[in-house]
């Protein structure tokens, strides 16, 4: 990995380009692997309610390692942390390829993702500063969503051809991410020399949680992003069951095409947020959050493919406009109070706890036999109400 004493804070520095490429490949692997592994579960006749369990073991790793990964990101050069984390993802994907239980392999990928996330977002504040940070977040989100778009489609299409080919493509993507990480400059650790006593680390993490929760702005950001990503992951699994019921289509590819529409929309929404929203005007994003739930409700009632595509793209636009300013707000305020790595680790805990809760409720609803269309209607209505309540609370405080 190259050494760098002076950091070029340009939005298009070599270091930033390497981060964006590594993020794209890593996120591509994550999303292709999800749909490839779902196809594997179908081929091996796992029950439908087990599909969300796959994502639950993934996010469970985030929650389990949440007290430690922020300190890891702040104690070492973040580029090296990202490279190690992508190596773990590569190992997990390869293990599924070689016949290891898919839930175990996917858990290992989750451990890698848990270590990767604080480093990938924390490094943005080290490679660029000030007004460029929101734009850097926009680039990161755009790269991520482009990877979701292409990775999801690739996973579904390749799985329709051959599941093993789809799994191998995921492993190759993770390998490419490891190589891209080599070109990230070696920056000084943000907070070196911290204690590695697990009890002290847990206590320190809880202190970071408390500090961020007591601050009105960071609490607002944590709740908003947690609701968004919890809902987003649940929507992905909802689509897998909704497509054959509402549209009468039973292949692996169609749900990935529909997910791709959300991804395209988020790219557009993220770009709009970077231009129209600043750290001082974050509340502008809240109406978009409410509209996400409203459009999900309308979408659940559709029975034609073209309106479904259009509505999912609109959901994505609203989502990108909603989440990018909240991410930037947390990074800026969190960097000054608890360190960027710890702030993102706390954010991951909130987001993944929301995912675990929402996926658990969704899996239970499927298990007890509630039809998927009423699930979608209730899901959209509850999300709109939750964001409305958050906005009212934010305006009062």
Swiss-Prot record:
Under CDD domains, the record lists: MFS_MefA_like
Membrane side Cytoplasmic: which residues?
A: 39-52, 112-144, 188-226, 278-280, 326-343, 388-397
Which InterPro entries does this entry report, sorted A to Z?
A: LysoPLipid__transptr_LplT (IPR023727), MFS (IPR011701), MFS_trans_sf (IPR036259)
The entry's localization annotation reads: Cell inner membrane
Q: Name one GO molecular function term.
A: lysophospholipid:sodium symporter activity
Functional summary from the UniProt entry: Catalyzes the facilitated diffusion of 2-acyl-glycero-3-phosphoethanolamine (2-acyl-GPE) into the cell.
Name assigned to this protein: Lysophospholipid transporter LplT
């Amino acid at each position: 990995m190259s050494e760098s004493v002076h950091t070029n804070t340009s939005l298009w520095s070599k270091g930033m380009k390497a981060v964006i490429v590594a993020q794209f490949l890593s996120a591509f692997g994550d999303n292709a692997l999800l749909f490839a592994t779902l196809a594997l579960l179908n081929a091996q006749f796992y029950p439908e309610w087990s599909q969300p369990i796959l994502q639950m073991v993934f996010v469970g790793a985030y929650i389990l390692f949440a007290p430690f990964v922020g300190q890891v990101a702040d104690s070492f050069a973040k580029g090296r942390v990202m490279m190690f984390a992508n190596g773990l993802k590569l190992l997990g994907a390869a293990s599924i390829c070689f016949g290891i239980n898919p839930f175990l392999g996917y858990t290992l990928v989750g451990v890698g993702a848990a270590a990767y996330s604080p480093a990938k977002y924390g490094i943005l504040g080290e490679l660029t500063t000030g007004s460029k940070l929101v734009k850097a977040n926009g680039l990161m989100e755009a790269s991520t969503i482009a990877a979701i778009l292409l990775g999801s489609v690739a996973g579904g299409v390749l799985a329709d051809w051959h599941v093993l080919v789809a799994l191998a493509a995921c492993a190759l993507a993770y390998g490419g991410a490891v190589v891209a990480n080599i070109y990230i400059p070696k920056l000084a650790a943000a907070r070196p020399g911290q204690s590695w006593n697990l009890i002290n680390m847990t206590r320190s993490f809880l202190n970071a949680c408390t500090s961020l929760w007591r601050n009105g702005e960071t609490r607002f950001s944590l709740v908003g992003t947690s609701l968004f990503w919890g809902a987003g992951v649940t929507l992905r699994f909802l689509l897998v069951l909704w497509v054959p019921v509402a549209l009468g289509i039973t292949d692996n590819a169609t749900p990935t095409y529909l997910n791709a529409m959300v991804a395209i929309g988020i790219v557009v929404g993220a770009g709009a947020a970077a231009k129209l929203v600043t750290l001082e005007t974050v509340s502008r994003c809240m109406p978009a959050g409410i509209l996400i739930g409203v459009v999900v409700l309308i979408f659940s009632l559709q029975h034609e493919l073209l309106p479904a595509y259009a509505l999912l793209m609109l959901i994505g636009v609203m989502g990108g406009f909603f989440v990018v300013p909240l991410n930037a707000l947390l990074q800026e305020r969190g960097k000054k109070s608890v360190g960027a790595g710890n702030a993102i680790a706390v954010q991951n805990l909130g987001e993944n706890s929301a995912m675990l809760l929402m996926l658990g409720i969704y899996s239970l609803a499927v298990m007890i036999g509630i039809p998927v269309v009423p699930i979608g209607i209730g899901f959209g209505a509850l999300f709109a109400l939750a964001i409305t309540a958050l906005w009212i609370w934010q305006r009062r405080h």
